[in-house]
């Protein structure tokens, strides 16, 4: 069963985490894209912004769920990674049409969209 919707940052790029000496937890800034959503979306967005490969993504999920996680959580995260990759790929293509280029970022986001769409579909079929 899905978790209740909650406030999500949705732009969990590493530049939006401010670490302050003497403070245990970082500050999270730039709430421009924030909204009420599935909390797992922030894990997915962090992974694609950090250009994590599969092993790193699995380590991130395991760190978020130290008590363990189920196949449904993984399928949801991978689905958000596919959709997020497509969103940011489309955004990059649009910005390129305006003369703003992002180099390998565009290709990286397309890769996330393709790879994680296949992965998520297989996971949903297994549920």
State what each model feature region is.
Residues 2, 32, 46-49, 78:
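Generic anion/oxyanion-binding catalytic loop in active/binding sites
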Residues 75, 79-83:
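Start-of-helix signal in alpha-solenoid helical-repeat scaffolds, especially tetratricopeptide repeats
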